[in-house]
Amino acid sequence: EARLWVAKEEARSIGFLAARRIADEVHVLSVAVDPEQRRRGVASSLLAAVLRDETASGARTALLEVRASNVAARAFYANTGFVAVGRRSRYYANGEDALLMTKDALLMTKDALLMTRST
């Protein structure tokens, strides 16, 4: 069962992150931010909230797939501690490959502690 985290500004939704927990792993399924709200930390805040919440309930690893051609998203995830560990050939409907990226528990715990201190 997937869970949804939503970022709001005033009463308006400006972004979301969907993730699914399987055993001790959290799988980031989708991240979207209103184009007018990009580069303002919305995706970073959503990702930090997911990692904090899931680490607190026992997640040890996070993983996601990202389009091989999506250079901006790949850089974003790398900057948040995710590491490319593999490739899923022809993963997307158009035949494009996906990069598999993961983040381990040590980094997730560190990020959760930093988020707790800054709130």
Q: For each predicted feature, which ranges?
A:
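Short glycine/proline-centered loop/turn elements that form peptide/ligand docking sites
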Residues: 47, 69-73, 90-95
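Conserved active-site tyrosine of GNAT-family acetyltransferases
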Residues: 77, 82, 101
